[in-house]
Amino acid sequence: HFLRIGANAGDGKMACDGIREVKKNGMKCRYSMMKGYILSAKELAEEAAMLEECGLDEITIMDSAGTMMPHQVSEYISEMVKKVKIPVAFHGHNNLGLSVANALAAEEAGASVFDCGLMGMARSAGNCATELAAAVFKRLGKLEDVDLLKLLHFIDNRLAPAMAEYGYKNPVSPIDLVYGMAGCHSSFAKLFSDTAEKEKVDLYELIIKVSEIDKKAPSKELIEQIADGMK
């Protein structure tokens, strides 16, 4: 069990008593440095070190307005991982469309935890979409234990229809995510969907398998051959 405490960057001293109380009650304590960008990277890292001394178990830099650029994220994370021994996390918003790029920058700089939301659901422009982050990290050979296609089907079949009732639209649909992950041009969409329906195989898996062989101009024959082998 854990409890997360959050305060604006620079206000960490007022959280020390709360951190100690959480620890006293046998829980792990995580801390969110909201609006982390209002301090310099060095100042934020120094505050993180102070909070670690209070007994903190994990600390998160929050890009609360979605204003940070990848090079800034890299600088902030790099400074912090040099200052503390506890895990450093990153929480990005997508106001500039950089949430995934920022997550990549954070990971490369030493962050080990990332806040995400399915379909990017969160306040304002949303958080880094869980499925996008998973796809990108899998492209890099990470998150091998994550069943991405199962997650995408859950979004297609359950989550997206439920959220449509509230007017929420997924900024990047699962099928478009698969095209990007596989390197498949969407002009072949009908050929793939018709074959998957006819042969009763998983569309997303078919796109990925075919694209491993031909990303330029997959033929109907190749697509049908791969589909037949998937049965």
Model-flagged regions — what are they?
Residues 1-231:
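Catalytic cores and adjacent flexible loops of soluble metabolic enzymes
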